[in-house]
């Protein structure tokens, strides 16, 4: 990298300054929006990056609502966790292998382009061909329902396989679910962060978080409104019209992915090349030394305590959020049945409310000193936010589910029907589950993701992308898959289809996870602070 030379005819010296001078001004801002630490000449790139992130998030959120609506209507809440436990891990491993191979041949930006093209093709193919022909390319709607109907399989203790059969019976909706999950892992969690980090310094990345969160909140809010409007519209039209509206929305989202690619290419050509401050010269000898490290990156990954700890941090969040979500979603299905509502309508309604809570919470937090917490030594507090919410879930999700299954259904597998003949409180269960599930996602956006990106920016950039492919691209989904495997195993052991009946076991697992999580974050906090104080890249801490 060479030093940028100022033109003699440059009329606005404000555009060309060192990063230290730029930060001195943005951290001296006052007024209502003082916590948005962006300089005037940074706004074009920040706004375009935020727009890119916002559209990516909107596709992810709307597609997530659609896939869940279809799955709740045509399958079972536990079906989605079977997909996560059986199909998601090999798909994640395949994509990580492809990314690692691709990064040895192409730049991260080019791999981002290829991924967007593939997803756009999948969504358009699904809307034009797969979904309209589902009646011809998959088994009859009643195939699994006839096999397991009237308790035929309960005497054989294999009734728990009912959600599994539905996954294969309704494989088109399973395919949509899998595509949506991989979009979240690859595009939202991995490629956008890699792209944004490639065009930003470490300190810029930390300052831009607040603007990204505004974009994220607006996108989630708009997605929630669209979901609720779509839900209301579906309730008043015929089945064929519902199907047509669903297909059109899928095709619009597939076309939007093409628009994301076009926006990214425009940014790379017109917006990002413009410098925002004087670039310092980097010594050639340092670059050569770091290239040697890049050749050893793969071997170092398996020997590094730091990278294992980051991976475990991501895994534990995935397991915890999955156990909470599984119990909450089963409660939604039970609540819909108890109140005589359609599961699709009920699920869409609660999804919309959840996203409105998330969006409003993010917008409120934006105008606080939150974005400066990492810079002021608050990494451990941000990283610990999901742990606090996990502790709250012990009471708000698992305890109330423990009560309701005892009052309304077969009781808890360990303690039986302790509350038999009592009135179930599904409104309370669904409401507390909604708040907790939304809080877990808020904790991810404001805590887990921010702290993870902060520690990622302390890793040497020449092999940061390959490491992030492991703990972002792989462990993010493997954590959810591991949580789903746990759910599937528990339903199999006790031959049940309602995961709420093992809420006592899930609660015990959450307590164990919280204890492990605490010590991992304590170690990561110590390593991060040492690197920040020394103003160096973080030590990989090999065994």
From Swiss-Prot:
Q: Which organism is it from?
A: Encephalitozoon cuniculi (strain GB-M1)
Q: Any idea where this protein resides?
A: Mitosome membrane
Q: Which UniProt keywords apply?
A: ATP-binding, Membrane, Mitosome, Nucleotide-binding, Transmembrane, Transmembrane helix, Transport
Keyword hit for Transferase: no
Official protein name in the record: ADP,ATP carrier protein 3
- GO cellular component annotations, sorted alphabetically? membrane; mitosome
Q: Does the keyword Nucleotide-binding apply?
A: yes
Q: Which InterPro entries match?
A: ADP_ATP_car_bac_type
Q: How does it sit in the membrane?
A: Multi-pass membrane protein
State the gene name recorded for this protein.
NTT3
Question: According to the lineage, what is the superkingdom?
Answer: Eukaryota
